[in-house]
């Protein structure tokens, strides 16, 4: 499940405002604001989190899970080069 810090970081990496994420995901701006205020794992509807994650992934964000090698995070995928 996404962490609120990952959502804020993904928006920053893309240069998105909360309104941009709302438009891309179909999730209301007030809901995004509430989710981002949380300090821990998200406690919202699963469908809401799936829509947010899908919008970021469509924009090129790759989420990294917490594991034995390190904490959670994210990165921006490389753009495919035309040959």
Question: Whereabouts are the PLM-identified features?
Answer:
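Helix-turn-helix/homeodomain-like alpha-helical modules used for DNA recognition
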Residues: 61-83
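Short basic helix-loop element that most often maps to the first helix and adjoining turn
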Residues: 7-20, 81
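Recognition helix of helix-turn-helix/homeodomain-like DNA-binding domains
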Residues: 27-44
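Residues in the recognition helix of alpha-helical DNA-binding motifs
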Residues: 10, 24, 35
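A detector for short, charged/polar N-terminal pre-domain segments
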Residues: 1-2
């Amino acid at each position: 499940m996404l962490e609120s810090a990952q959502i804020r970081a993904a928006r920053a990496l893309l240069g998105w405002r909360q309104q941009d994420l709302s438009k891309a995901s179909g999730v209301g701006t007030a809901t995004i604001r509430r989710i981002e205020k949380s300090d821990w794992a998200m406690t919202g509807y699963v469908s809401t989190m799936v829509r947010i994650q899908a919008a970021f992934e469509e924009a090129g964000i790759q989420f990294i899970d917490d594991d034995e090698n390190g904490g959670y995070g994210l990165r921006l995928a490389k753009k495919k080069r035309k040959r």
